[in-house]
């Protein structure tokens, strides 16, 4: 049995072995056969390849051996169709321009050919290539200053004559005989190094002009050390206008602390100030103008620099009493004549109490005596609940609406006329002045009515009744006033002096008042206060005692009152109005000497010292103030005109760094840090500057250390302003503006003058100017000037070259009065058109958008001449006309234009009305307030720097909330002047910029959002994910179907889109080019859409949200005052799990799959990459949210995802409700009103201009500024602790009233009278009779003010 089993096992083993060997053998054979088969197939393929190659080579050789026959060309059918199609299009395109006649047959043929043209385009499918904006360098005149400075060698006049002419020009324009008279007194003085020109103790009676060499002006400190405050170079002078005034008035004084010496061997021209006395004797009317200019310089230059910028107040005035003894008043009051300046105060107060005039306890009025003129009146005070009555103005009258003063001697008082213009009054006859006294009754700031009002008359001698005693005191006080004013004719004050008694607490005049009076205190005191800089607190400057004047500086200069006058105790004083004083001055010009001398005596010795250091410069257009790399030795203040700052880069290219307007501080950073000039600054147009040397600034810091705080404040504003400027921030982030025409730096702002020029004869320039004036009137006082009203006001010869100075001076005065002056040029190159261009800060080239973009004659003249003012292209469109198009062609033909705007004009602008009908129509238009949403209001806000920008952020479907916010903006009356955005914000912003209405924007946005929810389109757009998941074809078509072929330049609103340039690693701001392409590029998320190739330079553009998701800083750089930023981006989770130093993916997997484990918040790789991509964006967003110009809004849309486009209506409603709530709060709290107010009119101008020294830090600046020596503590006035707080109610002016649209918006001071008068039309368009009331402060054509006539 065992053997059988073994045999079976052995047999089985043998069988297995046999089968295994068979299997191995089979596999070997199979592999061999497979190998052989492979070798065979390979051999066959090789043979086939060799055979095919041999065949083609053989055929090619045979072809080469054969003689090639002449080819027979033929047109393919599609080529024939293309040829005839192009031929048809050429014919159809030219035919409409050659058709003549208005018959129906030609019109039908035109329509047929148009249909054929469109059909041919569809069949042939031509790809239309739209023109692109050509990048051009700015014109040389824009960024380059004139190379020729004040050239003495090439002049035909001697150098001494040129230098003297340059320096006496500060006193006004002297005619040739007057200047030659002055030149007779010039003396040459040779000085050696170290030799003194003058020293303390010598009489201060001369003007010194350096012809060769250099002088040093020194001020002696209290410890005897001399400080150099000014270096005088050839062409400059050493003088004090206050000292010249002392010589003219006969009160010469010696130098006390000021000296001058020659730093090197020098030649000096010496002109004694007494030479002016001889000129004034021959030309008495010149005296008024020279004194007025000296007073204007004192107020506008000295006080502007020392008070507004350095914060000095009490240091500028002499608190000591300058009163004269009231001898006549003392004799009448029954007291002995005393030598003290403030006279018999108690006796006068008892004699002038209101009870003296009352006949009963109920306050019945005294008998009023009146003759042919109202010579005297007296009254009792009314109860306080009867309201406030302006007794000052009621007693004196303003006379602004009476007829002009007629005088027979033409041309004899031209300087007096200019003085009248600067003082902003209209001359009157004596009778008109007297009659106006009883007719004027106004609301004022005076708390109570005066106890007595008397008008002086030497012919009236009635001392009976209750008013007799006061009448005697009044006449006695008037005699003392005659003594102070140095008048010997009492009749000059006849009917021109008012005697007032005010109780304690009366506010007599307020700081900033325009219509002021000269007050002569008889009893009591008037306290003079001034508001501190950047504070509401008042400080007491000085007290006006009996025998002293106050208010005379503002009357002489015509400038606003620079302090507040208040009676803290019962006070009696004489009052002379501005109009009355100028009537006295017309008869006796030398009256200004006595009045001006009282102003000079009130100035402190410190002001006298600084007057030697301060200079008043006149700079012609194109002249460089300083150049980049020059030594910083002074600071400039712009008084009038405009300056431009240009920086030269290392590669030699120039960039516009900024512009400076009226009141701006220039070069202060380099001066304080003692660094070289960082930029070149030149004059855009003729400008006036105040020059403050660095030495004078150092001397002021030594004497008054509190100035250091003010300087640090100014520097802080400069630095913070530069950081908040969009251009600066953009350059730090790689701001790439290659797509813009050229880098403008800061857009035009702080403009004082704007000129409008027509691009063709068909432009309705008159209607355009009136519409723009109407829109500007909502911002501030505006004046429209044309050649017609200039000739009507100033005479037919006003534009002649002989009267250039007088015209320039008058135009400068209008700039002082108005917020902005609008110049309407003529249709051709006339002298007035040249004057408009010369005076303009910005030039508007007005064209018709429907016309061909041809260059007009005036534009060609602008290109040929070096006009430095920036030019803006304004294209007018009809309301029912086609949308803007072909803007690129307009801009490419005008390289001198730095920007453009499209205006949709009302029908009245294009109406074919005659001039009288046009005037009549606009008279009615000006009775209504302008529409803040109109395009003209948008232009007005952009010209004045008050534009409101709307910035829309990116966030996918959450951006649908922005449509709801647009609805809320429209309902709450918030205008939008500039719009832009990123990603979905760029899309929504483009829709609104194209439509300008919420309803159309919502319809088109919803249409696009519905297309984004299509699953089929999404699937069809999928591609192999090498660059992105989608090809972008479907997304491109969805956007291009919305915007078609629109260009960014053709949008109604200024628009910009933000993209990320991954080729240059920079941010791109797109303001021109194909609209749909740049919107698509701004919406290209990485991984989903491929980058868009920029059609201009081929750079790859991605979603702008990676670098700036809420570009409020870009909108700020485009000129917006306020930026409303709507943030709809997703918020990142910040509460993440702290997992330690290492992280295991298995641990995270366990935490995720285990339902019982605690959930952890750890970012995955995709989230980490996304956050890295948005790091720069988050940083930029925080900067924007913390800026003071940005109003940040974020609707509650966190619950919606990025691709929830199907919830469009729901998200839109969320945005609307949030926006309506926020904007309603703005309306109630006054935020919206503040947005719409002029930034220069609501608050003091802050110097947040261009940061001209970018290489310094704030710490260094503060350290350098604080480097001063100890100084004495300034004496504090004992009266400074008086109560200074007061409340005042300004008169309410009805909005529906409208006085005049040619001088719209004149500021109505708290003490001014508002009497609306309806005119028939603007002075530029009406006869002189119709236009008389539109310039109430200017004399009539027949007046003897600024009227200019030919010498013949």
Curated annotation (Swiss-Prot):
Binding residue positions for a nucleoside 3',5'-cyclic phosphate 1: 170-297
All copies of domain PNPLA, residue ranges: 950-1116
Phosphoserine, modified sites: 341, 379, 1280
Record's compositionally biased regions (Polar residues): 394-406, 1323-1334
Disulfide bonds: none
Taxonomy, superkingdom: Eukaryota
GO CC annotation, single: lipid droplet
Residues exposed to the Lumenal side: 1-36
CDD domains found in the cross-reference section: CAP_ED (cd00038), Pat_PNPLA6_PNPLA7 (cd07225)
GO terms classed as biological process: phosphatidylcholine catabolic process
TM helices/strands, residue ranges: 37-57
Reaction equation(s) it catalyzes: a 1-acyl-sn-glycero-3-phosphocholine + H2O = sn-glycerol 3-phosphocholine + a fatty acid + H(+); 1-(9Z-octadecenoyl)-sn-glycero-3-phosphocholine + H2O = sn-glycerol 3-phosphocholine + (9Z)-octadecenoate + H(+); 1-(9Z-octadecenoyl)-sn-glycero-3-phosphoethanolamine + H2O = sn-glycero-3-phosphoethanolamine + (9Z)-octadecenoate + H(+); 1-(9Z-octadecenoyl)-sn-glycero-3-phospho-L-serine + H2O = sn-glycero-3-phospho-L-serine + (9Z)-octadecenoate + H(+)
Binding annotation for a nucleoside 3',5'-cyclic phosphate 3: 613-718
A molecular function GO annotation: lysophospholipase activity
pH effect summary: Optimum pH is 8.5.
PANTHER family: NEUROPATHY TARGET ESTERASE/SWISS CHEESE D.MELANOGASTER (PTHR14226), PATATIN-LIKE PHOSPHOLIPASE DOMAIN-CONTAINING PROTEIN 7 (PTHR14226:SF23)
Similarity comment: family membership: Belongs to the NTE family.
Domain remark in the UniProt entry: The 3 cNMP binding domains are required for localization to the endoplasmic reticulum. The cNMP binding domain 3 is involved in the binding to lipid droplets.
Function as written in the Swiss-Prot or TrEMBL entry: Lysophospholipase which preferentially deacylates unsaturated lysophosphatidylcholine (C18:1), generating glycerophosphocholine. Can also deacylate, to a lesser extent, lysophosphatidylethanolamine (C18:1), lysophosphatidyl-L-serine (C18:1) and lysophosphatidic acid (C16:0).
Protein name: Patatin-like phospholipase domain-containing protein 7
Source organism of this protein record: Mus musculus (Mouse)
Biological classification of the source: Eukaryota, Metazoa, Chordata, Craniata, Vertebrata
């Amino acid at each position: 049995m065992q053997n059988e089993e073994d045999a079976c096992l052995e047999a089985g083993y043998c069988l297995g072995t046999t089968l295994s060997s068979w299997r191995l053998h089979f596999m070997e054979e199979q592999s061999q056969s497979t190998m052989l088969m492979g070798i065979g197939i390979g051999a066959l393929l090789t043979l086939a390849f060799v055979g095919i190659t041999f065949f083609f080579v053989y055929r090619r050789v045979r072809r080469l051996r054969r003689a090639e026959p002449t080819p027979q060309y033929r047109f393919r059918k599609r080529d024939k169709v293309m040829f005839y199609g192009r031929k048809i299009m050429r014919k159809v395109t030219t035919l409409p321009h050659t058709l003549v006649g208005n018959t129906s047959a030609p019109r039908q043929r035109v329509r047929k050919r148009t249909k054929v043209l469109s059909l041919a385009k569809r069949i042939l499918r031509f790809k239309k290539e739209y023109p692109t904006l050509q990048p051009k360098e700015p014109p040389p005149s824009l960024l380059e200053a004139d190379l020729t400075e004040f050239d003495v060698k090439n002049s035909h006049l001697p150098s001494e004559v040129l230098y003297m002419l340059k320096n006496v020009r500060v006193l006004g324009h002297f005619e040739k005989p007057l200047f030659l008279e002055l030149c007779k007194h010039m003396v040459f003085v040779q000085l050696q190094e170290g030799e003194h020109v003058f020293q303390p103790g010598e009489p201060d009676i001369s003007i010194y002009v350096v012809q060769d060499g250099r002088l040093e002006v020194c001020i002696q400190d209290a410890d005897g050390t001399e400080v150099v405050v000014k270096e005088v170079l050839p062409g400059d002078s050493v003088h004090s206008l206050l000292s010249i005034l002392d010589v003219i008035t006969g009160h010469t004084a010696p130098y006390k602390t000021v000296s001058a010496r020659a730093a090197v061997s020098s030649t000096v021209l010496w002109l004694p100030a007494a030479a002016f006395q001889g000129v004034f004797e021959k030309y008495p009317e010149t005296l008024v103008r020279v004194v007025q200019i000296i007073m204007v310089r004192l107020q506008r230059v000295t006080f502007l620099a020392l008070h507004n910028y350095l914060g000095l107040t009490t240091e500028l005035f002499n608190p000591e009493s300058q009163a004269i003894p009231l001898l006549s008043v003392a004799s009448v009051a029954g007291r002995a004549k005393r030598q003290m300046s403030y006279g018999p105060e108690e006796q006068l107060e008892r004699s002038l109490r209101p009870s003296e005039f009352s006949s009963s306890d109920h306050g019945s009025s005294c008998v009023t005596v009146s003759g042919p003129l109202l010579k005297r009146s007296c009254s009792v005070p009314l109860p306080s609940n009867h309201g406030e009555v302006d007794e000052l103005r009621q007693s004196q009258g303003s006379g602004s609406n009476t007829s002009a003063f007629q005088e027979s001697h033409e041309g004899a008082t031209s300087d007096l006329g200019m003085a009248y213009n600067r003082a902003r009054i209209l001359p009157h006859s004596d009778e008109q002045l007297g009659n106006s006294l009883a007719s004027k009754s106004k609301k004022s700031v005076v708390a109570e009515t005066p106890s007595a009002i008397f008008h002086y008359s030497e012919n009236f001698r009635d001392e009976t009744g209750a008013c007799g005693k006061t009448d005697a005191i009044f006449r006695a006080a008037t005699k003392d006033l005659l003594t102070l004013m140095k008048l010997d004719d009492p009749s000059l004050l006849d009917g021109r002096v008012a005697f007032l008694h005010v109780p304690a607490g009366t506010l007599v005049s307020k700081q900033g008042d325009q219509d002021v009076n000269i007050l002569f205190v008889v009893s009591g005191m008037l306290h003079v206060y001034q508001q501190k800089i950047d504070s509401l607190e008042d400080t007491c400057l000085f007290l006006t005692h009996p025998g002293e004047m106050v208010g005379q500086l503002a009357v002489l200069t015509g400038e606003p009152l620079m302090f507040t006058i208040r009676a803290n105790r019962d006070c009696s004083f004489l009052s002379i109005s501005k109009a009355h004083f100028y009537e006295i001055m017309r008869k006796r010009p030398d009256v200004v000497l006595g009045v001006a001398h009282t102003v000079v005596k009130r100035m402190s010795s410190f002001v006298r010292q600084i007057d030697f250091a301060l200079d008043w410069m006149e700079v012609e257009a194109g002249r460089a103030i300083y150049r980049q790399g020059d030594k910083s030795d002074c600071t400039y203040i712009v008084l009038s005109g405009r300056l431009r700052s240009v920086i030269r880069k290392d590669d030699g290219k120039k960039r516009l760094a900024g512009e400076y307007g009226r009141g701006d501080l220039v070069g202060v950073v380099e001066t304080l840090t003692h660094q070289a000039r960082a930029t070149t600054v030149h004059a855009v147009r003729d400008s006036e500057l105040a020059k403050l040397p660095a030495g004078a600034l150092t001397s002021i810091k030594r004497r008054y250390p509190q100035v250091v705080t003010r300087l640090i404040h100014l520097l802080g504003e400069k630095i913070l302003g530069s950081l908040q400027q969009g251009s600066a921030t953009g350059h730090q982030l790689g701001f790439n503006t290659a797509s813009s025409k050229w880098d403008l730096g800061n857009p035009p702002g702080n403009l004082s003058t704007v000129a409008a020029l027509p691009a063709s004869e068909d432009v309705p320039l008159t209607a355009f100017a009136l519409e723009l004036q109407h829109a500007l009137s909502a911002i501030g006082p505006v004046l429209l000037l044309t050649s017609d009203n200039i000739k009507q006001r100033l005479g037919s010869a006003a534009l002649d070259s002989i009267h250039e100075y007088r015209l320039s001076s008058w135009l400068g005065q209008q700039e002082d009065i108005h917020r902005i002056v609008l110049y309407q040029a003529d249709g051709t190159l006339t002298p007035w058109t040249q004057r408009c261009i010369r005076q303009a800060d910005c030039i508007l080239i007005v064209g018709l958008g429907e016309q061909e973009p041809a260059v007009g004659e005036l534009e060609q003249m602008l290109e040929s001449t070096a006009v430095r003012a920036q030019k803006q292209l304004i294209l007018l469109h009809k309301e029912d006309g086609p949308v803007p198009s072909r803007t690129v062609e307009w801009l490419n033909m005008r390289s001198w234009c730095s920007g453009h705007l499209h205006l949709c004009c009302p029908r009245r602008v294009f109406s074919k009305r005659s001039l009288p009908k046009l005037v009549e129509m606009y008279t009615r238009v000006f009775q209504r307030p302008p529409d803040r949403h109109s395009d003209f209001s948008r232009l007005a806000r952009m010209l004045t720097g008050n534009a409101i920008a709307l910035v829309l952020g990116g966030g996918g479907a959450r951006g649908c909330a922005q449509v709801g916010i647009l609805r809320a903006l429209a309902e709450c009356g918030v205008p939008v002047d500039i719009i832009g955005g990123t990603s979905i914000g760029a899309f929504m912003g483009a829709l609104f910029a194209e439509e300008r209405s919420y309803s159309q924007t919502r319809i088109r946005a919803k249409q696009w959002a519905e297309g984004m929810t299509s699953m089929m389109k999404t699937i069809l757009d999928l591609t192999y994910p090498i660059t992105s998941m989608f090809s972008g074809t479907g997304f491109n078509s969805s956007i291009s179907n919305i915007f078609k072929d629109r260009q960014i330049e053709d949008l109604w609103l200024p628009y910009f889109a933000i993209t990320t340039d991954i080729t240059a690693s920079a941010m791109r701001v797109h303001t021109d080019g194909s609209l749909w392409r740049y919107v698509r590029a701004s919406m290209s998320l990485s991984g989903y859409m491929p980058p868009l190739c920029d059609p201009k330079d081929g750079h790859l553009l991605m979603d702008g949200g990676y670098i700036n998701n809420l570009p409020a800083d870009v909108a700020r750089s485009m000129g917006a005052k306020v930026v409303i930023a709507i943030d709809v981006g997703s918020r990142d989770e910040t509460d993440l799990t702290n997992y330690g130093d290492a992280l295991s993916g298995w641990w995270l997997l366990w935490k995720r799959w285990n339902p019982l484990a605690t959930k952890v918040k750890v970012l995955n790789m995709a989230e980490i990459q996304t956050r890295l991509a948005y790091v720069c964006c988050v940083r930029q967003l925080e900067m924007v949210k913390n800026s003071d110009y940005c109003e940040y809004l974020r609707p509650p849309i966190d619950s919606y995802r990025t691709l929830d486009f199907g919830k469009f209506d729901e998200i839109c409603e969320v945005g609307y409700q949030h926006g309506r709530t926020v904007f309603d709060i703005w309306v109630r709290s006054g935020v919206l009103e503040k947005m719409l107010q002029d930034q220069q009119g609501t608050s003091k101008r802050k110097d947040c201009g261009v940061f001209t020294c970018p290489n310094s830090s704030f710490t260094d600046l503060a350290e350098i500024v604080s480097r001063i020596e100890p100084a004495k503590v300034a004496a504090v006035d004992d009266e400074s602790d008086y109560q200074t707080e007061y409340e005042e109610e300004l008169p309410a002016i009805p909005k529906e009233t409208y006085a005049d649209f040619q001088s719209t918006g004149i500021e109505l001071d708290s003490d001014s009278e508002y009497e609306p008068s309806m005119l028939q039309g603007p002075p530029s368009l009406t006869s002189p009779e119709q236009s008389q009331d539109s310039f109430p402060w200017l004399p009539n054509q027949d007046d003897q003010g600024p009227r200019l006539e030919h010498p013949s």
